[in-house]
Amino acid sequence: MKVAKFGGTSMADANSFQRVATLIGENPDARVIAVSAGGTSEEYKEKITDLLIDFKNGESLGISRLKAINEIERRLIELESRLKIRLNILDELLKIGRKLPNDLPSDFLLSRGEYFYAKAFSEFLSLPFVDSKEIIKFKGGVLNYGFTEFLIREKYREVGRFITGGFYGSDENGEIKTFPRGGGDITGAILAKALNAESYENYTDVDGVYPFSPKMIKRYAERTAKIVKPLQKISFDAMLRLCDFSVPVVHSSAVEILKGTGIPIVVKNTFDRFKSGTFVSENCETEDFCFAAESCEKIKTVLKNGRWNRTRAELSIAENSGKTFENALFAYMPNGELTEEILREISRDTPLDFKTETDEGEVVATDKSRAENVKKEIFDMFILLSRRCHKRML
């Protein structure tokens, strides 16, 4: 059996529901499905969770709380109409809307997106809905792994295939507790581990794990789509290193939960089911790759705190803006063989002076007047080097 998790964009609207239903219909081994709250799409520009945050903080932010609740209601009614299903959750939403946000526990309020969308999707698929608060248990503010795994196994034996919401559970008093933002990935990993799944399939809106952050994929979409391909395979260790820099599309805690279990993670695109995605496994030989990170400050922090204490080649190139480093390029090679080549290419093709700090693997552009050119030249260099790395994989 497999566990599948579908993110916010996969749940955004009626078209997305139908697309995911097709994927699940073609994948009978996916026995447990965790879903996120509705995300953005061409039709909807706001995430459901963000609307709930607006409701909670509306008055202080100058936003109408009623407007936020009305928008959530509109989207749920649209699901009802277009999917021809009957939702019994609108009354629950209206009860929330009639209360003052301070009367509602924050975790409870923020978890309602996953709760509503999991119930709606279970109704659409005619599969049992399992409230995550029944199977994901916290104690003393942290996850109670042993009890949680017991409850998940018992529930699976009882109902078989089911739908549940990601991101939340409950504590020993029955109060709703949430994971960090993006915690739906964590829920999926917990389910996969508890059920000793064949694999954990994490569906998102990109073709797999790219060697740079999803934000950069969208920002440089035209160039990256034509040149840089997602990684076909990557080890858990390398994936965790990418997680340090907010590069992958899977939460780092989800990766840590499954590391050492023998359960691989498969990152796939909901919107292109013919793409193979990225296979994250324990003992695979990680391909050579380089990757770009959003912030060099994050690189410095990780290298200093000792988490990345490996005999690896580390190199970063960044614009020094005076306060923060932006558009950093960070290259990671398992065997270090490309380091000299990268340095040579950069010094030859980029008309800047560089300062090398070998203890942190940092190379900083010193000519601040060329900041915009630095951004473009560094990213172009990243594209060039990524293409070379991928050629070596093929």
Question: How would you label these PLM feature ranges?
Answer:
Residues 279-394:
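A conserved regulatory-domain signal marking ACT and ACT-like small-molecule sensing domains
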Residues 24-28, 259, 347:
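N-terminal cationic-hydrophobic initiation segments that often serve targeting/anchoring roles
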Residues 77, 122, 189, 255, ...:
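Short glycine-/small-residue-rich flexible loop motifs, especially phosphate/cofactor-binding loops
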Residues 1-249, 356-369, 390-393:
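Nucleotide/pyrophosphate-binding catalytic subdomain
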Residues 235-300:
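A conserved active-site cap/scaffold subdomain adjacent to cofactor or substrate pockets
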Residues 85, 127, 247, 263, ...:
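Short aromatic/hydrophobic-glycine micro-motifs
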Residues 8, 15, 167-168, 269-272, ...:
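A broadly conserved detector of short glycine/acidic/proline-rich loop/turn motifs that flank catalytic sites
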